[in-house]
């Protein structure tokens, strides 16, 4: 179930009718990701972001994509204006791994919230291909993603 129906954020309310079961960033939902051993899709944006609205319309309203995300990931949506501290963590990741960033900021995280991928806007087919690849890698060889994340964190230290 999408949890964004009764929120103050105009940006999050805009996603309330998405077929994706968007959740809030909370200790409970993060514990659920660990218990279910699921990757997290973290999508961060804000109301005035043009490409956030385009991706919401083209990608996040797509039933096929929503079904795949709902079955295989914990899906979290954040308004960067409400949680700049979370946005900052994952914006640092994309800046350090790709050299540039922006919004929407779409991340794939391990169940313990360590990042393994970050990108910005994706068309529907590209997004589905991307998340399908990460899902398959995590199911078939999770150590590969865990090692990548560990190497990134060690590189920063």
Positions of PLM-derived features:
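Replace the tail clause
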Residues: 1-157
């Amino acid at each position: 179930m999408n949890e964004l129906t009764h929120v103050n954020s105009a940006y999050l309310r805009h996603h309330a009718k998405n077929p994706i079961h968007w959740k809030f960033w909370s200790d409970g939902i993060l514990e659920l990701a660990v218990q279910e051993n699921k990757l997290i899709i973290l999508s961060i944006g804000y109301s005035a972001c043009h490409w956030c609205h385009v991706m919401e319309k083209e990608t996040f309203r797509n039933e096929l994509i929503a079904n795949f995300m709902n079955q295989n990931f914990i899906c979290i949506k954040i308004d960067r204006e409400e949680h700049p501290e979370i946005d900052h963590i994952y914006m640092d990741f994309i800046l350090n791994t790709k050299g540039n960033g922006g919004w929407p900021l779409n991340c794939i995280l391990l169940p313990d919230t360590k990042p393994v991928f970050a990108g910005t806007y994706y068309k529907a087919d590209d997004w589905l291909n991307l998340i399908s690849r990460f899902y398959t890698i995590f199911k078939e060889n999770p150590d590969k993603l865990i090692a990548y994340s560990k190497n990134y964190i060690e590189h920063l230290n």
